[in-house]
Amino acid sequence: GHMDHCQNAAYLANALNIPIAMSKKDINMIPDNREQKMSAKTLLGKIVLLVSLRSFEKDTLEVFEPMVYLQDGDNLNKYGVDAKVVELPGHTEGSVGLEIEGDKLFVGDALMNMFYPTISMLYTDKDKMLESAKRIGEMGAKTIYFGHGKPKRNRKWVK
């Protein structure tokens, strides 16, 4: 995943003695977040992309080794978390969400609420990003927790 979501993963894993979990599809981003080329369509998205790319160039990411590789449908009960993994590719190749208690969905950057709730402004694969946004919308009445911004009720994100 991107630095703004995993920059402290190594520190937290060591300090709390917990495993790092992520999708294997994003493993190439651990040493360098620029490994997956990002695109944006809107002016606001292009501004966010420019700021993100500058951050990737100057910020450092302590290299870490994931202990758990997440896949669609994985249940995390054995790790003490009542959650199910939902693959939401598009923002990155390995974007995942967590469905918790049946009515909460943590979506990372598959959707964004930086300025207003919307589909992801940045993506590695626009078609997959739109498919993931559609999948989220079809998951019914849930509270959506974004990687950025306040939670909102689920709705159709793609027409």
Predicted features, each with a name:
Residues A10-N14, R34-M38, G102-D103, S120-L122, ...:
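Short, glycine/charged-enriched secondary-structure capping and boundary segments
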Residues G1-V68:
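Active-site HxH/HxHxD metal-binding segment of metal-dependent hydrolases
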Residues D59-L61, N75, D82-W157:
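Metallo-beta-lactamase
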Residues M29-N33, Y79, F115:
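Residues that scaffold the ATP/ADP-binding catalytic core of kinase and kinase-like folds
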Residues V68-N77:
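Short internal loop-to-helix segment that lines adenine-nucleotide cofactor pockets
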